[in-house]
Amino acid sequence: HESGQYLFPGSGGVEEIGEGAGRGTALNVPLLPHTESDSYLAAFDRVVPHALAHFGPDVIVAQCGADAHYKDPLADLLLSSEAYETLFRQLLTLADKHTDGHILCTLGGGYHLDAVSRIWTVLALVVQDIDLPTSLPDDWRERWTAHIDEDLSPTLHDPEPSFNVKRRAAIAEQNKETSEQMLEQVTPHWH
C-alpha cells in the first residue's frame, strides 16, 4: 500500500506489526508515491510468498482493490492493468501451493471507473482461467461512455504506460529496503 506518510489515514508503517499474541502477524509495506509496477511486484515477491510459507494458511483472503492503478485519482501509485494481472496470477499460484487453491478475492478500492471495471474484469477472467479478449465490444464502450463522460479503453489492458519518474531508481531501492525492514521486524516473532 502507499505509505501513510502521504495518504490518509496515515497508518500502515513497518513498525505496526500487531500486538500481544498477534505481534508479528501484521505485515505493512508502505511504498513511496510514484511506485511503478516493477517495484510493486518486487515487494510482493519479496514478502508474500515468505509470509505464506511461514503462516501456512487454510485460505487466502485477498482484497483486490484497484486504487494502486496509475489512473486512480486518490493514490499516487503507478500500477498498470498488466501488473494487476500478474498479481492475480501469482495469488492463484500461491493459493495452489499453500492452500490447496482456496482463495477468496474481495473487491473494494479504486476510484477511476474505467480502470476499476477493467481490473476487476481481468480478475474475474483470471480466476476462471478464461483467456483475456484482445478488445472490448464497441457497443458496450459506447453505451457506458455516455454514462461516465469519459472515453473507455478499447482493451482490458492499458496502453503501455510511460511515466517520467525522475527518482525511479531511488524509489525502487527505498521500497526494497522498506520491504526488507518489515521482514526484519516481523520474522523474530515467528516461531
What are these regions (language model features)?
Residues 1-191:
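A general "terminal functional-core" signal
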